[in-house]
């Protein structure tokens, strides 16, 4: 009984250590520190920016000073037209750039979804400018 109590923790410790070594050997990177990540939500920032049917807020994630992801937040735009904006690559165009660089990029409205895409571009620019300040 005493031998089992001694061996079990040792085996578990060895297993945990080996899992950590395997994880690092596979090139996994630790998650960025919270201080390395900035998230800008344009819901309040662009309250007066309206697409065809309403606001088109975005969530912009910046990691270590570079735009990592841009996501459209829930909105009331007609899905079939808003999907054109999402499929156009407009939100991905700024990924990999600093917020200041991305805010200055020329971005074109999407044909067939002009009002929605212009509102998304306005949200994107405002959010990027806000991120560049921080």
Predicted regions span which residues?
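Repetitive helical segments and hydrophobic/amphipathic motifs
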Residues: 13-14
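Flexible, solvent-exposed loop/hinge segments and secondary-structure transition points
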Residues: 2-9, 18-134
